[in-house]
Amino acid sequence: MFQGVYTAIITPFKNDKIDYDSYNKLLEKQIKAGVNGVVPCGTTGESPTLSHTEHAELIRETVKAVQGKIQVVAGTGSNSTREAIELTEAACKDSVDGILSVNPYYNKPTQEGLFQHFQAVAEHSSVPVMLYNIPGRTSINLQPETVFRLSEIKRIRSMKEATGDLGQMGKLISLVGNKMTVLSGDDNLTLPLLAIGGVGVVSVVSNLFPKAMVEMVKYFQDGKVIEARKIHYDFIEAFALAFMETNPIPIKAAMSWFGHCEPEIRLPLTRLSQNETSVKFKKALEVLKEKGYE
């Protein structure tokens, strides 16, 4: 089962191609910071704009680059169950440590449809499956009762929870018990979720500040709640501003500001708007850097 800090890693582009030089440096940064793993080809990695060839290549190159030093949980979700299975099987052949499977978007299946979709994906996976519930992007909410049913399936071992609803998260944790781990899909709710039984985060902000996110989670797990809380409060403005526009627009801009990649992003997403809010975001990040956060 997955726990700790997993970075929903960006996909850097240069001249509309994946920039592997920058990408490998990002992976090195994550390894050095001590994250538990990275999640390529997720929402933050702009997976909807990757071709099937790019998707497979990016996962393969990630596994090769990290050399087993951290886990690779590959995004293989689709609104077509058949396609999700194909992506999952391909990722498993490339020796990933797990897969991230998002709710089928656009189709708006029933809870039974969601159950059967994830059941089918899990049956074709040779590695643990992390479910991904993000109704704000998929228009469908994977209910705790459905997750409880799914927790009986051998391969389904974790869930990335991005509903923003702590009440639902608490109910989910109480239902699945020790059958599954639950990780936050919202940076600003990582600490609150840990307090009610969550075990980590799939983080966007850890692209830029992986060590800080690792420290916050570890402090809490070690019983150093005050220290964990300090990091949470220091980052609270950055957590909010990192989602001032559709993810990954703000974090992609932030990574470019600090020299980690080009600001390039693929349509239909566009570059971060230049306004008072973006200036505020950059300043908040600079303040965190001045405080010594990495």
From Swiss-Prot:
The record marks 43, 106 as: Part of a proton relay during catalysis. SMART domains: DHDPS (SM01130). GO terms for biological process: diaminopimelate biosynthetic process; lysine biosynthetic process via diaminopimelate. GO terms for molecular function: 4-hydroxy-tetrahydrodipicolinate synthase activity. The keyword Acetylation does not apply. InterPro entries: Aldolase_TIM (IPR013785), DapA (IPR005263), DapA-like (IPR002220), Schiff_base-form_aldolases_AS (IPR020625), Schiff_base-form_aldolases_CS (IPR020624). Keywords: Amino-acid biosynthesis, Cytoplasm, Diaminopimelate biosynthesis, Lyase, Lysine biosynthesis, Schiff base. Pathway: Amino-acid biosynthesis; L-lysine biosynthesis via DAP pathway; (S)-tetrahydrodipicolinate from L-aspartate: step 3/4. Pyruvate binds at residues 44, 202. This is 4-hydroxy-tetrahydrodipicolinate synthase.
